[in-house]
Amino acid sequence: MRNPEAPRLVGVYRRVVPVGARRVIAEHVDSGFRQQVKEGIAAAAAKRDQINRVRVARSHRKLLARHDRRVVSVGKAPRIAHVVPRATPLDARRANLDDVTEALRHAGIDYFCVRSASETSTAVAVREDDREHVITALRQACRVRPGYVIPVGKGEPLDEAALPAFGTGPWKRVSGSPVFRCTWYRTDETGRMVFGLRYGCDIEFWHQEGGELVSPRRNPVAEAVPVEEEATEADESLFTDLAPLPEDRIPRAGEDLDAGDGAAGGPRPGLVRTRPAFAAGSVGRRTFPIDVVYTWVDGSDPAWIRSRAEFSDRPYHEEAANAARYLSRDELRYSLRSLNLYAPWVRNIYLVTADQTPDWLNTDHPRLKVVSHKEIFSEPTSLPTFNSHAIESQLHHIDGLSEHFLYFNDDVMLGRETLPQHFFLPNGLGQYYLSPALIPFGEPNSEDPPVAAAGKNNRRLIAERFGGSTIFRKMKHVPHALHRGVLEAIETDFADEHRRTAASRFRSAGDISVTSSLHHYYAFHTGRSFPGDQLVYRYLDVGKPGAERVLGRLLAEREAHVFCLNDTTSTESELAHQQALMTRFLDEYFPFPSPYERGADD
């Protein structure tokens, strides 16, 4: 898909031209003409990129003779990338570290891994005295498998400045650098996902001062280590919060967690070679598991449709039974893909359904469990239910669920790497994300949208429980960081309202919204959560004008940690168009299956 929002010129226009001026232009220039201009720019950029890729391919035919290599475009720059089926950011990080350390071991060069400030790149320390041997070893590795190098100073290196390390000239540029980064670009089979310098490995040259090796730059742990100190092994989760905790880790394909890597002489899988200072667990390190819970409904299931029809004569508000609310656009499939890509630290995933299972779901995956409403509802007479407020009120009853967990709606996706601390601090405190949208004042009534009515009820309960404290704001549509203990307290403290919500088959004016609002305000008042501001978030109602343009920007920029694709306005006649629009976008953003899909490993 050619994205008219992707070219750099379009991005520069938005950054340079003030919002007011852009509005004036929009008022006086036909939208169709503006779209034609952007499409023309996109076509020219695509042609330029193609020419550059062909030029590189012709210049390096031998390097590209293998089927698992291809030329990709990163910004304006063509790069030789290694095709890794279903590669993830954590995979790219691990692979670059493995490539560097294997080259060093093969050359007999001592090294140790360093904990750096980055969660995506790695860092390896070598002795300054070994500089010539290090450069020779890595230069040879980059000739065999084409890689790139760049000196590292302040700030994150830019992909367009990376130097092709399969030539001789670039090594002269980095030969005297205290730190340089070595990267082998990775891409998936489609070429749409490219993992570049952000996931590379920094080589730090530590010099000797007396009995110590001293770092050329600061790091979060130790700037000097004893020269004669023995190396040790440490879990990779000590070096990046992207990695799962040791007890939550499952083997990669063909990997034995109990076996050493005898052939290469390296550390066991999941471990890295380091020094004792870097193997120590820090005070700020997370030690508790985090699970994910989804609620899902198959709105096309004939049995479910018949059941819903039996109870849906008089929904109190048109949004309460809006067809778009129950329509499955396969958002769950893509949300799980986003979780696999950008939150590999999650332990288990629970999918709560009305005895429904997507036919594409890999229910044999060890991290995934489908949970029936029947397993969690305290009162069986409340079923069947078609009320998300009711279902959400029962999530803490899931057997085996961790104390700290994230609640995802299936229309919520991760758009880039997220970390546990975006949701929970290492001491267990949760973070919630306030929306600028306000809860209306007044008593709930039949004219209120369901979210407004529930917000009003939440407001009353918080004021009564915590001495007149008034809540004003709604929450953003992000993964909700929840505590089971808080949900249990809400069920006890607000027993009547909780029971009434659980028993309401459709959203009603008497509902409370437990997971998406009430929990956060209750947890705040009891010292277990606080307002967060770390997530870059985008919300889009796909039924509104301009949705295609906004989706194009999301795809081009990939800067949002979280985005939500909601639909509160589409009529049934508009759903087919919205379906096509969303599917096209999501296939581009998440182009390959996750392990949670059947046949993903075929």
Swiss-Prot record:
Its EC number is 2.7.-.-. Belongs to the stealth family. GO terms for biological process: polysaccharide biosynthetic process. Residues 251-271 are annotated as: Disordered. One of its GO terms (molecular function) is transferase activity, transferring phosphorus-containing groups. Stealth proteins are part of a protein family that is conserved from bacteria to higher eukaryotes. Family members were first identified in microbes as proteins that help pathogens to elude the host innate immune system. Microbial stealth proteins are involved in the biosynthesis of exopolysaccharides. Stealth proteins are predicted to function as hexose-1-phosphoryltransferases. It comes from Streptomyces coelicolor (strain ATCC BAA-471 / A3(2) / M145). This is Exopolysaccharide phosphotransferase SCO2594. Keywords: Exopolysaccharide synthesis, Transferase.
